[in-house]
């Protein structure tokens, strides 16, 4: 079997799919994207195609190494996201050829189900509480919400009070009936993170995500030393070599590699194993589409340290398409009591509606994250 063609499709709301075709008619799907940089990743995918056309798709490890090492310059969000989507599609092909789901090819299940959590948007506490109530009605009891808006390097007590007030009202409304993580999106400086974490402790969030940027990862162990709240990060780390440094330094309780950013299934399975060796939990980052989610689930079901799975149903970014709009076998992604079950169809287990993909790719928007500025006009972290 040989790879004959690679096609990319930019899609709403902010996704990109790729299709790898073979001379025997077997097709694999992947999801390579950096949100707001889809065209750049798309160009990288087609550059990598030079290494792939005419090659045997079964040699996933060799093709991965060729893409990673053959160009001398390597790593980073663009190239690792391109590799990630290609890698997903290669595993999809392998599973279809062998008539087995990817988790079966990786040694089989370590669990029967994995808890899902849902994003909750809203700028005011009442909106967040209303969003949680609606999601509880369809079975969710675990959530993630933004921890704060933009925050200055040294900000005032009003900014701290606003962040804490939202969390306090949520805990008052629901008590211990729900769990929630707080995503700070790297918006907070190390000095302000210390203040916020101390103020949030009484409300027992499930985790705090990206309290500081990955570029300031040296602060993770320092922040962890002053709190009992688990600290999570990893969506902006792109290889096992980056994760190696933070695992060795300590501080993170939960790793969040993104299967569409960090080299795909092949790389993230290695990252999961590294995390287990350090007694660190795994919770793959996934505010993206169905192929990315499927890839995450296959890792979850073969990794003992996986604890819960992010998914994008109803997320505030989903304008123009929802999580399963491009999927024919929607029933396979249904949740029972807020848990996903293993995908059982061969390969990734996603039956893509190719006609719909082609149609909506003709008018896909170039999604950009907002540009935020502080009151003084300086650029803020989004």
Curated annotation (Swiss-Prot):
Gene Ontology BP annotations: amino acid catabolic process; D-galactonate catabolic process
UniProt keyword Membrane, yes or no: no
Highest taxon, organism lineage: Bacteria
CDD domains listed in its UniProt record: D-galactonate_dehydratase
Job description of the protein: Catalyzes the dehydration of D-galactonate to 2-keto-3-deoxy-D-galactonate.
Enzyme Commission number(s) from the entry: 4.2.1.6
Family: Belongs to the mandelate racemase/muconate lactonizing enzyme family. GalD subfamily.
Matches recorded under HAMAP family: Galacton_dehydrat
Keyword Ubl conjugation among UniProt keywords: no
Xref: PANTHER family: D-GALACTONATE DEHYDRATASE, D-GALACTONATE DEHYDRATASE-RELATED
A GO molecular function held by the record: magnesium ion binding
Active site: 185 (proton donor), 285 (proton acceptor)
Site features described as Transition state stabilizer, chain residue numbers: 310
InterPro entries, per database record: DgoD-like, Enolase-like_C_sf, Enolase-like_N, Enolase_C-like, Galactonate_deHydtase, Mandel_Rmase/mucon_lact_enz_CS, Mandelate_racemase_C, Mandelate_racemase_N_dom
Site-annotated residues for Increases basicity of active site His: 258
Cofactor note: Binds 1 Mg(2+) ion per subunit.
Keywords for this protein: Lyase, Magnesium, Metal-binding
Cofactor: Mg(2+)
Pathway info: Carbohydrate acid metabolism; D-galactonate degradation; D-glyceraldehyde 3-phosphate and pyruvate from D-galactonate: step 1/3
Catalytic reactions of this protein: D-galactonate = 2-dehydro-3-deoxy-D-galactonate + H2O
Organism (species): Salmonella choleraesuis (strain SC-B67)
Binding site for Mg(2+): 183, 209, 235
Other facts: Reaction proceeds via an anti dehydration.
Protein name: D-galactonate dehydratase
């Amino acid at each position: 079997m040989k790879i004959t063609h690679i096609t990319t499709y930019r899609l709403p709301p902010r996704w990109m799919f790729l299709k790898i075709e073979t001379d025997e008619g077997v097709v694999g799907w992947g999801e390579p994207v950096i949100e707001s940089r889809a065209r750049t990743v798309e160009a990288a995918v087609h550059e990598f195609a030079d290494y792939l056309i005419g090659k045997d798709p079964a040699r996933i490890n060799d093709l991965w190494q060729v893409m990673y090492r053959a160009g001398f310059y390597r790593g980073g969000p663009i190239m690792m996201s391109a590799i990630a989507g290609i890698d997903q599609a290669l595993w999809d092909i392998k599973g279809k050829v062998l008539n087995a789901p990817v988790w079966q090819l990786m040694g089989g299940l370590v669990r029967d189900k994995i808890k899902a959590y849902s994003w909750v948007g809203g700028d005011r506490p009442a909106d967040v509480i209303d969003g949680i109530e609606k999601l509880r009605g369809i079975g969710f009891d675990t959530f993630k919400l933004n921890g704060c808006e933009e925050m200055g390097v040294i900000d005032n007590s009003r900014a701290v009070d606003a962040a804490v007030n939202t969390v306090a009202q949520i805990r008052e409304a629901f008590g211990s009936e729900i769990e929630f993580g707080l995503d700070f999106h790297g918006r907070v400086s190390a000095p302000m993170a210390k203040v916020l974490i101390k103020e949030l402790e009484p409300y027992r969030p499930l985790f705090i995500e990206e309290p500081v940027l990955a570029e300031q990862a040296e602060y993770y162990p320092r922040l962890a030393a002053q709190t009992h709240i688990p600290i999570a990060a990893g969506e902006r780390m792109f290889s096992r070599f980056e994760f190696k440094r933070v695992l060795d330094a300590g501080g993170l309780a939960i790793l969040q590699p993104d299967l569409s950013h960090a080299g795909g299934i092949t790389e993230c399975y290695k990252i999961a194993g590294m995390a287990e060796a350090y007694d660190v939990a795994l919770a793959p980052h996934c505010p993206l589409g169905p192929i990315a989610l499927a890839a995450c689930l296959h890792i979850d079901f073969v990794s003992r340290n996986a604890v819960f799975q992010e998914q994008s149903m109803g997320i505030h970014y989903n304008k123009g398409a929802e999580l399963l709009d491009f999927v024919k076998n929607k029933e396979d992604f249904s949740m029972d009591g807020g848990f996903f079950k293993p995908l059982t169809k061969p390969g990734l287990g996603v039956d893509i509606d190719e006609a719909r993909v082609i149609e909506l790719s003709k008018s896909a928007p170039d999604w950009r994250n907002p540009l935020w500025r502080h009151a003084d006009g300086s650029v803020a972290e989004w």
